[in-house]
Amino acid sequence: MLEINLNHYNEMLRYERDMDELRALALWITRCDPNLSIPGLAKPREYVFDLIQHYSKKFAADIKQHANISPDSIDLFHSSLFSVKLILGITAQDLEEASQQQLYRNSGFWEMRRFIGQFGDVAEAAVSAGVTHIVSAAISGCIIGEYLGLLMDEQFHQPVPVDHMVFLRSGALPIAGLLRQQFQICGDHVLIADDAVMETRTAAVMLKKLREICPDVKISIMTVDIDPETKYSEFMKQFEQVYAFDE
């Protein structure tokens, strides 16, 4: 399997096919009974959350070190998911449905390549602002959030937990957020990592979920793409900080 190089835009479609595998896992979580038990897999829902996090972090580490997702990581990813999909009953139709549920095409993690040099500045600002927890919008925000977490840890010696929120959807629109069963907010300042804030729907769902867990927590947001009208809207004033990127 060839590497996926961030500098080659024509590799986006191949990258997106791999991300559809993770999107199908997220879709499975939304349909799963939280108490489901599978022989040999006592807590499948939590295991799938672990898989999403493991590969998001692995891909982020590859990008930080090599500016690409390595062939070994991709091979391991496909080998692991082949077995997992069989066990969970995830089909090609599920992958297609998960792909179609994206709000935005040609956005998400792939677009971070335009701003890769600015992530260090955001990490430094997040450390200075006292960010204690990152929650990513799955799936497109997962690698973005993990990448930022790595920078905060390795460059600024401020490790923070990174979690991933998946979404129940009506069509492509998120209507509710789901987190691990044992999820707890760490500290008092959460940073939402989202791929694109071209509207307020996803961010609103994430805000609601986090406020249900801890009404007084401070919440900031980082996004790769943001609609200018949304950026200066009343809605965005709910956030402590809004971290965006300059072309």
Sequence positions of predicted segments:
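PRPP-associated nucleotide enzymes
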Residues: 1-247
